[in-house]
Amino acid sequence: MKKQFLIALSICVSTISFAQITSTTPTFGVRAGLISSGIRGDASNNLDNLLSFANGAITTSNHTGFFAGGYANVPVTDMVSLEPGIFYAEKGYDLNGSLNIKGVGFLGANAKAKLQSTYIDIPVLLKVNISGFQIFAGPQFSYLMKANLNTTAGLLGFNLLNSNMDATQQFNRWDAAVTGGIGYKLGSGINISASYDYGLSKLDANKNANAYNNAIKLGVGIEF
């Protein structure tokens, strides 16, 4: 995976260098937005089975996070460009549980677990621009900076447990994904985009569990 990361950086440098020796001029931009992330694979299927057994007492939801960073847009033709970038991205997964047994529901017993992982994402996109409308796809290489697991439990409105654990060592530090999406760019350089990341690398550091990152990103950016 480290080799793939170096390849991604080499592509970024090569595309910008290529533009400098042709008549095209690269533009640079910044982009930020929201991420809705989750997991897929055997681990997700096992969790779904647990949810069915719990009959609604446990619910899951995608983790909502934030991403921000910069990119270079390097024209190849009038309609096609390469866009390498580097972004800070928050990903993860949320799990909520409640005890609603008849006669003791007034106790308000509940538990929550939230996994928040912070990554550095390096996408290298091939982008097609048609009168402002954009279609793009390409590989993305990511490095896990930190994974934090927060668990809480409560009863009668009181917090009985509030634990934060550094879970970084439990996860693969390197991740690879395929990303693609659509967007629109205004004449002023302001652009909007929606994309989907499909993880290809196992999240488990020991590679025992088949769990992979998935994420939907909605972003707003501007090019200079």
Q: What are the roles of these predicted feature ranges?
A:
Residues T27-G29, Y184, Y212-F224:
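Outer-membrane beta-barrel "beta-signal"
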Residues G38-H63, K91-T118, L144-D175, T179, ...:
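Extracellular/periplasm-exposed beta-strand and loop segments of Gram-negative cell-envelope proteins
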